[in-house]
């Protein structure tokens, strides 16, 4: 996968092969600039591969994937819209929900309120984003990415800008949402503890041009509590991943 940068063509990904089963929670880690975010844009159809194919449920991806939801490092909520209206925005602009929005608005609003309750924000629908903390805004962002009931959730470092305590709190929020709704997740993160706590499998990428150089299964029983992060076995996996990433950074 190449793209045009300021100084010419950049080879971001090369000979990359990644297979994620339906319902899996996958995490992608690797050194900065290895192509993790490029991989995410390929999977969601925002970029077309210059070689090879991307397929979801056996169908080649040729454009933006409607069954996918996305959340990023910054919540990017519209400050002039109330929380409930920020949640409903994807349903207002994406088909087939757009054509149904007027007739199903009551149903869609109930869905949004149910999501807010699930993430501990019951009663906050009529607030504006600037009235919420950073952690609360990220909860709203997660809800917005799930409002159209996607089968695939793509997360690009969604908790990176938060403090450690809020970050761990939102790990548990995401864990509970995934266990309740059972969508497929691909999480791009630099936080190795986050990856080990949340994922079924961790895909380690090389330095650019990015390739998958290791797939690390995580076998801790579910549901996982934060107590598992203090186990020696947990720390051992984190150290193994850190050593692998250090190795590929200089290779």
Model-predicted segments: where are they?
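ABC family nucleotide-binding domain
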Residues: 1-182, 186-191, 198
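A general structural signal marking secondary-structure boundaries and capping sites
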Residues: 3, 123, 150, 206, ...
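Short hydrophobic beta-strand elements within the C-terminal catalytic ATPase subdomain
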Residues: 56, 204-205
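Extended, non-globular alpha-helical segments
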Residues: 161-164, 238-251
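Conserved catalytic segment of ABC-fold P-loop ATPases
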Residues: 197-204
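Conserved beta-strand-loop-alpha-helix hinge in the C-terminal portion
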Residues: 207-240
């Amino acid at each position: 996968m190449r793209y045009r940068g300021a100084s010419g063509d950049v080879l971001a990904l090369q000979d990359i092969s990644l297979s994620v089963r339906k319902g899996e929670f996958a995490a992608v880690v690797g050194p900065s600039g290895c192509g993790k975010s490029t991989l995410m844009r390929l999977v969601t159809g925002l970029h077309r591969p210059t070689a090879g194919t991307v397929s979801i449920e056996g169908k080649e991806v040729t454009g933006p994937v409607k069954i996918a939801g996305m959340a990023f490092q910054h919540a990017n909520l519209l400050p002039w819209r109330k929380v409930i209206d920020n949640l409903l925005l994807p349903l207002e602009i994406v088909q087939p929900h757009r054509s149904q929005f007027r007739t199903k608005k009551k149903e869609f609003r109930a869905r949004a309120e149910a999501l807010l309750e699930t993430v501990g924000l019951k009663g906050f629908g009529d607030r504006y984003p600037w009235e919420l903390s950073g952690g609360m805004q990220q909860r709203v962002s997660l809800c917005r990415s799930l409002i159209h009931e996607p089968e695939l959730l793509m997360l690009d470092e969604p908790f990176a800008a938060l403090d450690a305590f809020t970050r761990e709190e939102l790990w548990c929020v995401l864990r509970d949402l995934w266990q309740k709704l059972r969508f497929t997740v691909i999480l791009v993160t630099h936080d190795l503890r986050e990856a080990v706590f949340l994922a079924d499998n961790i895909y380690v990428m090389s330095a650019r041009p990015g390739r998958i150089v290791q797939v690390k299964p995580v076998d801790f029983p579910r549901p996982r509590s934060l107590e598992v992060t203090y186990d020696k076995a947990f720390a051992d996996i984190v150290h193994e991943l850190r050593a692998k990433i250090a190795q590929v950074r200089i290779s």
